[in-house]
Every structure is written in C-alpha cells, then in structure tokens.
Swiss-Prot record:
Protein name, entry field: Catalase-peroxidase
Broad enzyme group: oxidoreductase
Documented EC number(s): 1.11.1.21
Native organism taxonomy: Bacteria, Bacillati, Actinomycetota, Actinomycetes, Propionibacteriales
Post-translational modification: Formation of the three residue Trp-Tyr-Met cross-link is important for the catalase, but not the peroxidase activity of the enzyme.
Length: 760
C-alpha cells in the first residue's frame, strides 16, 4: 500500500504534542515532538473567502436553518436516463473481462505516471482503502458506497494526494464498460483485484454501489486548514461524529500525533480512529500490516515544490493536481506524503514479511529528504534488502512509520502482531475479513450486494433470516388489522412502536430499520427514546396476536411485519376518525433477527441523540433541536415536504416520547388531522419561552393571555423558518385535509419500507 497514512501537521495549537504515559521504548535520537517542516503535501491550504460581500443566506443570517441537504442528489444532477437501474445494467457486465482489464492496467506502467516496482498494486490498494476508510460509525457517513472520492473535498485532501492518478489510470477501463460498472464499485474492486494479483486470497467482493453526481456536504471537522486538529477537547478527546485525527486525513498522522514520533502516543490515536470505523484491535493490526505489505510512500524531495490539489489546479491540468517541479515530478522523483518508506523486501507480493521486519530490527528515527519523521534499522542493518521502486540497480534498507512501530510497542497491539508473525495463516484470514469489512461496511445488508463473488454473511452486516414461510394474504392482513385495533392498544402506542422500529434506519450506511424486529432486542428495547416500559407492553400484546395467528396454520407473519402493520392500522383508524378513508400500503416479507445476530455494541451508535418526530432531545444536548431534526430527516432519506407532513401528523397521533403534550396542537389527539399546522399558523397568538421548563415555548392567546399550547423549537421552526412555513401553509389550508392524509401516508410508508432492499 502506498501513502496510506502519509500526512503530518505542525505542532498542535492546543498543546497536545506529548509523549504517551510511560515514555516511548524506541530511541528518538533527540528529535523533538514538533511536526515535520514539510507536511503532506506542504502546500497552502485552500483559503476561505473572507472580507467579501455576503453571497449566501448563511453569510447574511448565520443561524438560518439549511434544508438543502434534504434535496441533494436529486435526479436533476444525474446524467443517466430516468429509468436507469444500476442493478439491471450490472447484470450485463462481464466480471471476468473487467478483472482482466484491471490486471492489464496493473502491469502496464505509464510514462506519465510510472508504476512503483512495475506494478500499480500498492497505488490501487491505497485508492480503495482511502475510498472506504472515510466511513465513520456515529452517523454512517463516508465510505466507498457513492464514489465520493471523485469529488471535493475528498479528491483534494492531502491524504489522497496523487490518487487522482490512480483514478485516471482506471478511466480507460471505466470508459470501456460504461454504466455497467459504477465508479464507486470500480474504485474498490480495483483494489481487491490488485491484492489478488499480488498473491493474496480475498474474502470476496460485493458490487452494488451507485455513483453520486455532485459533492456531498459532510461535516469533516471544524478546522479551516489542512491538518488542523481543533476537533479535540480535554485529554485528547475526539469530537463526535468525526473519525480521523486531523482535517484532510483518512486515519492518523503516520509520524505520530501532530508529528510527534512517539509510537505509544500513535497507538492511542490509531485505536480511537479505527474504532470509529468499526474496527477492533485485531482488525486494526491486520489492516495496517496487510496494507503496508505492499508498495511504498513517497518523499523524494522538498514538498514545497508540490503544486496545488485538483480543485485548485488550473484548467489545463484537467482535474489532476499536485504537479511537482522536483526533478521529473514522477517515478523516483515522486513527492506525495514527504515520507520515503518501503516496508518489505517484496513490495508487490503477499507474504508475512512486514511483521518479521518489524521485529527483526531495532529502529532509529531519521528524516526523509522532505524532512519527514520516519524510522530505519539501527547501525545500518538491513542495507540493500529492499529494491528501489524504479532503478533495479539500487537497494536500500526497510523503513517504518511511527504508526507502524505502534503495532510492536503498544502492549495490546504487540500481542496480536507477535501472533500474526508466528502464524501467517491467522494473519491472512484476519486481513481478508477486515479488508472485506472495510470495503463493504457502508454497503448495508447482504440484500444490496450484487454479483457472484459475495463472501459469507458476517454479523456486522446486521443479518436477518430468509423468509421461510407463506406470506400473509390481503384477507389475512385485514383480519390482523382488526385484531390489533381490538387489542386495547391505543393509536399512540401502535404508531410510536412502529415508528421506533423503523426510524432507526440510516440512509448513509443502510443500517437500522424495521426488518429484523430488533426493536425487541438489546440494545434498542432499552433506549430511553423507545420508552422501554410502554414498548414491553405493546410487544407483549403483538406477540400474542402473532402467536395466535401463526398457530392457526397456513400463512405466517413475523413480528417485524406485524409491528409495521399494526402502526399502519392505527394510521388508517386515525385518518378515518378524521373523516378520510385511506389504505396504508403494506408489503409483507420482513423477518425476525435473533439476539445472536445482533451486535449490541455495534447497534449502540444508532441510538438517537434527538428525534424531532418524537419531540425527543437528549438531556444536555448542545446542538439546536431544529438542526437535529433536519439531520434525522436526512438519515431517513426524507425531503423537506415529507419531513414537514410527518412532524405534523405524528404530533396529532401522539407520537411524542413520554406522552408529552408539546407540539400536540389539537383538541383531537389520536386523530390524523392537519390541526398542527392550522393552529401553529393561526393569528392572534403570542409565543414566548417558558419560564419553568427548558427548551419549551408557551403559546398564549394574545387577547386574554390564556395558555393554549406548549411546543418546542422543533415545532416552532415550521412557523419561523420561511421555507418550512411555506410548506406548512399548504397543509394548513382549508382544502388540504385529504392531501395532508395522502402525503402523510406516503411519507409514513417510505420510512416503514426504508430498509426493504429485497423489494428494490
């Protein structure tokens, strides 16, 4: 792998450059904990426009609620035909022909960007790793699933320097196979093929990633310079939901925290960052060592000679950045990270050399030609053991990164590294599984995987059993609805349970949702937002109905299906009570996962900090509730109109956590009406913050001062924000009663079916 972690930063402005407790067991030779003078790459960061005339709503009104994220990636940005379906086009792909084409690229060195060691394997592994490695567990963003590495800011991050060349090398392959293979799939499949071509046996590969056509607005950190680290507080506590240690990095600084070459301090950063990618210690060691079995990093000269990144490069660069004026600027003169390291004796062959070399030598700190911190064997050991990447007559010693030495000197990592050194078969299997997880973590359930190369199902894919019974008929559905409505459960109880089951879905990494009925399992059944005591009672009643129906013989219904069906029956009843007859579409086919199929720790990150659809906000939450509502809507894949109609309808249905009356702006709770909007926008009201309850507002009659309603910021935003008010006005209108119900049902079904990839 080449330059997988090759970036550094100047000394932290927050003073966190320090050695780990107990000191470092590796000789530093008097090198300070300052960062290298030549960072990766040592070019100016993009300069945000300042002092100019405001040119956006946010410039004029910084607190303006931005809804644009709810309308990103619309069909208007795609050049593909309206009826295009990637899964159907993919079926036409000759996968073996694609593989052969990639292998040919791997072995065909191009003069405009020569291959290290005559093989682009290390470069392609790095490209795939960095595409997938942006994934983070806290909000499911990042990852390889959309081909986002093609766009800013990722295409211009310092950690992705010269990966523009890797994608350009692949362009003839993409051009040949067209829309039968997405860029998102091709980028990571090329890395997979590269590993196999260098002798590694992978765990498998699943296609199915669909391209986006515009950059995605993602919060990558608060910094406005490359390699800034304002994301820390306290004792180097990394802010959520971030994963990387510095702006513009995929993982950690390879020289050590903020350029401090301390392996033990580096281990702390590595453990935190990889955990936020859903990797445990064994997976972390396997990934780093497996990736660094291949290729090299690049620091041939002064990084000040490296030009701007792709987004800042001139038109004539045609999307390529980091043009270097050092020598030829390529081949043996390449500058990417400023670090000049080749880890193993055979950089294009899978083997166990990384660990043997790591333990075979004692290491001393040295500087690259670019001034970067790196490590070599003491006393000139290992000289002439490593080939030169471009001149077969030259040899050199093996070298390591500070982050590599962490795998030897951190006590927990050392146990794993030592075992992998002595048991190469365990290392190979661990790397195969960890690599598979890395590439597929954001692809979602196995139902989304395409192609014949898919590996054995893993628990991190949140598996659900296959359907093994006859599904319910329309008559069965009608009978079950009647049973549910006659069970004594209220509309609010049925709706809130169905919502809690389905609304855990995240469109980012396709996790959560109603399929599997994990609402009845830990950890979800104990989340405060899911009202555990009420939930237990509802589930007990529904399980009784399920048991009675299934014991009758014939068709069967899963609890996952019944929870959704029960909520839909409640919506139909509430609409009818409001004078509108409607049938909520229902498609059976969900199954029930077991606790053994559910990784409790993995699911814990899905617990919401806030859910504006339930008027729920975690105590001491600092973010604005209305901003968190938009975030929740985004994760559910909703548009602004869908978010609007759902909030209004769910308030009327009593979906608030704890039965709170905040935002229930109706005299007919439990009836599906547009009262929320009508009363919110009604003139003659005075709104003011409550003096007795935080984050609550009182709505009083302007003339009498009588308290009429209470609400939260999530409610008031639909009257305050001009864009949301325009939507609320549609649903508050006298002619909107039936439209409101229709739109609510459509949005409700969208959430209930969000994880039904089997229906796609």
């Amino acid at each position: 792998m080449t330059d997988s972690q090759d970036n550094r930063t100047p000394e932290s402005p927050q003073g966190v450059d320090r050695k780990a407790e107990g000191g470092c067991p590796v000789l530093h030779d008097g090198v300070t904990a300052q960062g290298s003078e030549s960072e990766n790459p040592a070019i100016d960061s993009p300069t945000p426009r300042t002092g100019g005339r405001p040119n956006s709503l946010k410039d004029w009104w910084p607190n303006h609620l931005d809804l644009s994220v709810l309308h990103a990636h619309s069909s208007k940005s795609s050049p593909l035909d309206p009826g295009f379906r990637y899964s159907e086009e993919f079926e036409k792909l000759d996968i073996e022909a694609l593989r052969r084409d990639i292998v040919e690229v791997l072995h065909t060195s191009q003069d405009w960007w020569p291959a290290d060691f005559g093989h682009y394997g290390g470069l392609f592994v790095r490209m795939a790793w960095h595409a997938a490695g942006t994934y983070r567990i806290h909000d499911g963003r990042g990852g390889a699933g959309q081909g986002a590495q093609r766009f800013a800011p990722l295409n211009s991050w310092p950690d992705n320097a010269n990966l523009d060349k890797a994608r350009r090398l692949l362009w003839p392959v993409k051009q040949k196979h067209g829309q039968k293979i997405s860029w998102a799939d091709l980028i990571v499949f090329a890395g997979n093929v590269a590993l196999e071509d260098m002798g590694f046996t992978t765990f498998g590969f699943g296609f199915g990633r669909e391209d986006i056509w515009e950059p995605e607005e993602i919060y990558w950190g608060p910094e406005d310079t490359w390699l800034g680290d304002e994301r820390y507080s306290g004792d180097r506590e990394l802010s959520n939901p971030l994963g990387a240690v510095q702006m513009g990095l995929i993982y950690v600084n390879p020289e050590g925290p903020n350029g401090n070459p301390d392996p033990l301090a580096s281990a702390r950063d590595i453990r935190e960052t990889f955990a936020r990618m859903a990797m445990n210690d064994e997976e972390t060691v396997a990934l780093i060592a497996g990736g660094h079995t291949f290729g090299k990093t690049h620091g041939a000269g002064d990084a000040d000679l490296v030009g701007p990144e792709p987004e800042a490069a001139p038109l004539e660069a045609q999307g390529l950045g980091w043009h270097s004026s050092f020598g030829s600027g390529k081949g043996e003169d390449t500058i990417t990270s400023g670090i000049e390291v080749t880890w193993t004796y055979h950089p294009t062959r899978w083997d166990n050399e990384f660990f043997h070399i790591l333990y075979a030598y004692e290491w001393e700190l040295m500087k690259s030609a670019a001034g970067a911190n790196q490590w070599r064997p003491k006393n000139g050991a290992g000289a002439d053991m490593v080939p030169d990447a471009h001149d077969p007559s030259k040899r050199r010693e093996p070298r390591m990164l500070t982050s590599d030495l962490a795998l030897r000197f951190d006590p927990e990592y050392a146990k794993i590294s030592s075992r992998f050194k002595d048991h190469p078969e365990e290392f190979a299997l661990a790397f195969a599984k960890a690599w598979y997880k890395l590439l597929h973590r954001d692809l979602g359930p196995i139902a989304r995987y395409l192609g014949p190369l898919v590996g054995e199902t893993q628990i991190w894919q949140d598996p659900v059993p296959a359907v093994d019974h006859e599904l319910v008929s329309d008559d069965d559905v009608a009978a079950l609805k009647a049973k549910v409505l006659d069970s004594g459960l209220s509309v609010a109880e049925l709706v809130s349970t169905a919502w809690a089951s389905a609304a855990s879905f995240r469109s980012t990494d396709k996790r959560g949702g109603a399929n599997g009925a994990r609402i009845r399992l830990e950890p979800q059944r104990s989340w405060a937002v899911n009202q555990p005591e009420q939930l237990a009672g509802v589930l007990d009643r529904l399980e009784g109905i399920q048991r009675e129906f299934n014991e009758a013989g014939g068709a069967k219904i899963s609890l996952a299906d019944l929870i959704v069906l029960a909520g839909s029956a409640a919506v139909e009843k509430a609409a009818k009570d409001g004078g509108v007859d409607v049938t909520v579409p229902f498609r059976a086919g969900r199954t029930d996962a077991s606790q053994e199929q559910t990784d409790v720790d993995s699911f814990a990150v899905l617990e919401p900090r806030a859910d504006g659809f339930r008027n729920y906000l975690l105590e001491n939450e600092k973010a604005q509730p209305e901003v968190l509502l938009v975030e929740r809507a985004y994760l559910l894949g909703l548009t602004a109109p869908e978010m609007t109609v759902l909030v209004g309808g769910l308030r009327a249905l009593g979906n608030n956590v704890g039965g709170s009356g905040h935002g229930v702006l109706t005299d007919r709770p439990g009836v599906l009406t547009n009262d929320f909007f009508a009363n919110l926008l009604a003139p003659g009201a005075q709104w003011k913050a409550s003096e007795s309850e935080a984050n609550v507002y009182e709505i009083r009659d302007l003339a009498s001062g009588e308290l009429r309603w209470t609400a939260t910021a999530v409610d008031l935003i639909f009257g305050s924000n001009s864009q949301l008010r325009s939507l609320a006005e549609v649903y508050a209108s006298a002619d909107a009663r039936e439209k409101f119900v229709r739109d609510f049902v459509a949005a409700w079904v969208k959430v209930m079916d969000a994880d039904r990839f089997d229906l796609a």
